[in-house]
Every structure is written in C-alpha cells, then in structure tokens.
Amino acid sequence: MKITKIETIRLQSRATLIWIRVHTDEGLVGLGESWFGCAAIEADIHDRVAPALLGQDSSRIEALNRQMRPYVGFTGTSAEMRANSAVDVALWDIQGKATGQPLYAMLGGATRDRIRVYNTCAGPDYVSKSSDVRPGNFGLDRETTQRGKVFDDLR
C-alpha cells in the first residue's frame, strides 16, 4: 500500500490539538494525533514529512520512522518529534485496518484485560464530564474518524 496523501486537521474548538490523516492507494486512511505547537507541527508535516513519505509503502513503519528521524531536532518545542509521532500512530492505524487486528495484537498481544484512561497533555476539558467519562469526537465528522467517534471503543 502506497502513501498517496498526508493531511492535517485543526479545529478552532481544540486549538492545542492536531489530527493527521495518512491516505493510501488502497483507500485506507490512518488517523494520528498530536498536541501543542500545532502550527509548527502542521508546517513540519507538509514541508518535511509528506514529501519524504509520499509514494512509500505504508506497512514499512519502522523504515519510515528511521527515514524521518535524521531530521528531528531534540531542542526547542520538538515539533518534529510530535509530527513524527502523529504519523507513526496513523501508520499503525492503517496497518491495523489492513490486517484486521488491533494494535495490541500486532505488538505482541494483550497483557491485561483493561487499562485506565488518562490525559497527559490536552487539558482538563479534553475528557467529557459525563458519568461514563467518554470523550466525544471533538467536531471530527464520521468520514474523518471512520468509526463515528475517535474513542468509540473505550470502556
């Protein structure tokens, strides 16, 4: 599967978050996410990452990560690292969709039945205050998430 397009999605209502969609020639789309310094992340995605990855095989995740790594700066706001991370998440999303497997299975299998949900970076209103503590889709439409909600499967 070749990467045909990499796009960024930013919402005014979530100014500290950015989503990345990686498209393939087989119609699969992977969704990744990052935070903080979204303008710098977006510029890095479009100026550095997309030109390097377009036309590449999306299943070669580690090779693509190594290809992006030499350009990473480890000082400042680390926008490059966060851009790479978002693309990595999107590539794993594609791989899971292509194989019909959840990420935990591709990485060696489950080690526990459930995990706690936590929020490290997006602020206290990231998770809804509803009784079931489930986040919404943050204004992303069904086409963007391909499942209706970004976190549809949280328990």
Give each language-model segment a name.
Residues 1-21:
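Short, Gly/Pro- and small/polar-rich lid/capping loops
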Residues 8, 33-34, 122:
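Short clusters of small/polar residues that mark proteolytic maturation junctions
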Residues 23-99:
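Metal- or metallocofactor-binding catalytic centers and their adjacent structured scaffolds
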Residues 106:
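Active-site-adjacent beta->alpha loops and helix N-cap segments on the catalytic face
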Residues 109-110:
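Subtilisin-like serine protease catalytic core
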Residues 114, 119-155:
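Metal-dependent enolase-superfamily TIM-barrel catalytic cores that perform enediolate-based chemistry
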